[in-house]
Swiss-Prot record:
A GO BP entry: glutamyl-tRNA aminoacylation
Gene3D superfamilies linked: 1.10.10.350, HUPs (3.40.50.620)
Protein encoded by which gene: gltX
Record organism: Burkholderia thailandensis (strain ATCC 700388 / DSM 13276 / CCUG 48851 / CIP 106301 / E264)
Binding site for ATP: K246
GO cellular component terms listed in the entry, alphabetical order: cytosol
Main location class: cytoplasm
Keywords: Aminoacyl-tRNA synthetase, ATP-binding, Cytoplasm, Ligase, Nucleotide-binding, Protein biosynthesis
Protein's UniProt name: Glutamate--tRNA ligase
Catalyzed chemical reaction(s): tRNA(Glu) + L-glutamate + ATP = L-glutamyl-tRNA(Glu) + AMP + diphosphate
Stated role: Catalyzes the attachment of glutamate to tRNA(Glu) in a two-step reaction: glutamate is first activated by ATP to form Glu-AMP and then transferred to the acceptor end of tRNA(Glu).
């Protein structure tokens, strides 16, 4: 194909957008960027009852968060109704579509008879004009639907970039309704007109659309359009092996941001959820665009793995700038009841991020683990009884005294701790655990010297002495 590459993401704004949905934006975006092409955003909002501005906003917000910028759009199908009606009128003039007066009740009865006879339920062409055929008299006061005159013979075939060669006999396809009785164009028709008008060369979408493809190809050919390359992506499964959906517990795209995931981690994970480049697991956005191709799209359903996402997010958190993490963490601190004033009065937040990030899978987890720096310690009675024993109290007193005069560096704190351990013949946990408990309120912290350094001399000494008084 010599035409400049033009891809599209065409979601329906009917509610929830999860990772499986947004993957259908990621791959066409990446392919357009790889091929120096154009990425088009189209909002397919013909389902007026279910579509909402809130859902549109969620789509736009999710794309922006992941950095999936579009070159054209967003186009809204409801704003293009005049164009669809114009094309329908042209097709009706050429005999490519025709009015059908079969009622819903008649169509249901026809399908029941076909099922009873062991036949595939389908429209039988009662109102389809043919040479020499006498059509029924149109019923008075009944508005017809418009149906597309699907070819009666031959096959519809395309070489799907994922599924390979697909062939459907036209005998399997009935005449599709392309406009409702009130004249409103139908979804499958609007899609074809949009793809034609927008010059779409590659349609990369979920394989739940594959059954629409032969009908769309026939309409496109009737309009004189060039058939695009199709790539129908296998579905994304949740961890239980079910199709990913809100009903089955899927999280929204922005839910990942709100849970403390970094967009680069989610994008990296999403890229591998149905595509691969050798054994590469971790790669930048730029590498992904450079490597992306349709040939390496997976042919089997991809299964979501939350632990894998956490592993990737931890990697990107460790690589992230500490000041950036500090900014991202503030809303999570606020949710814990730690306001800006408490953070301002406590240890330097950027330094805290640098110390605490390595162990965390999410930014939310960093904030939870770092809350000890911005709260008064409140160790439980059982923990105090276990760790702050009469045997260790003299060592705690001596350690607090030593900290009053040492140079306030990580190395000097570690040396003071080692000296007290030696003098009292204690092992590291016997002293480090009670110090952690009295200063931070928990025994679970990174290296004791690094933690004390951030708390600061005055806080450390005063908390140990107050607990021993």
């Amino acid at each position: 194909m010599t035409r400049p590459v033009r891809t599209r993401f065409a979601p329906s704004p009917t509610g929830f957008i999860h990772l499986g949905n947004i993957r259908s934006a990621l791959y066409p975006w990446a392919f357009a960027r790889k091929m120096k092409g154009t990425f088009v955003l189209r909002i397919e909002d013909t389902d007026v009852e279910r579509s909402s501005q809130e859902a549109v906003d969620a789509i736009l917000e999710g794309m922006a968060w992941l950095g999936l910028d579009y070159d054209e759009g967003p186009y809204y199908q409801m704003q293009r109704m005049d164009r669809y009606r114009e094309v329908l009128a042209q097709m009706q003039e050429k005999g490519l579509v025709y009015p059908c007066y079969m009622s819903t009740e008649e169509l249901d009865a026809l399908r029941e008879r076909q099922r009873a006879a062991g036949e595939k339920p389908r429209y039988d062409g009662t109102w389809r004009p043919e040479p020499g055929k006498v059509l029924p008299e149109p019923p008075a006061g009944v508005a017809p639907v418009l149906r597309f005159r699907n070819p009666l013979t031959g096959t519809v075939a395309w070489d799907d970039a994922v599924k390979g060669r697909v062939e459907i006999s036209n005998e399997e396809l009935d005449d599709l309704v392309v406009a409702r009785p009130d004249g409103t164009p139908m979804y499958n028709f609007c899609v074809v007109v949009d793809d034609l008008d927008m010059g779409i060369t590659h349609v990369i979408r979920g394989d739940d659309h594959v059954n629409n493809t032969p009908r769309q190809i026939n309409i496109l050919r009737a309009l004189g359009g060039e058939v695009p390359v199709y790539a129908h992506l296998p579905t994304v499964l949740n961890e239980q092996g079910e199709k990913m959906s809100k009903r089955h517990g899927a999280m929204s795209v922005m839910g990942y941001r709100d849970a403390g995931y970094l967009p680069e981690a989610v994008l990296n994970y999403l890229a591998r959820l149905g595509w691969s480049h050798g054994d590469a697991e971790i790669f930048t956005r730029e590498q992904f665009v450079e490597w992306f191709d349709l040939e390496h799209l997976g042919k089997s359903p991809a299964q979501y793995d939350h632990n894998k996402l956490n592993w990737l997010n931890n990697h990107y958190i460790k690589e992230a700038d500490d000041a950036r993490l500090a900014g991202l963490a503030k809303p999570f601190f606020a949710a814990l009841g730690i306001d800006a004033g408490a953070i301002e009065q406590g240890p330097d937040l950027v330094s805290v991020m640098g110390l605490m990030k390595d162990r965390a899978s999410t930014v939310k987890e960093i904030a939870e683990n770092s809350a000890m720096f911005y709260r008064a310690p409140a160790p439980g009675a059982d923990a105090l009884a276990q760790h702050v024993t009469d045997a260790v109290r003299p060592a705690l007193v001596e350690f607090a005294a030593a900290l009053k005069t040492v140079e306030w560096t990580k190395e000097a704190i570690a040396a003071a701790l080692k000296a007290v351990l030696g003098a009292h013949k204690l092992k590291m946990p016997q002293l480090a655990m009670p110090v952690r408990l009295l200063v931070a309120g928990t025994t679970h912290t990174p290296s004791i010297d690094a933690v004390l350094l951030l708390f600061g001399r005055d806080v450390v000494v005063s908390r140990i002495e107050a607990a021993l008084a």
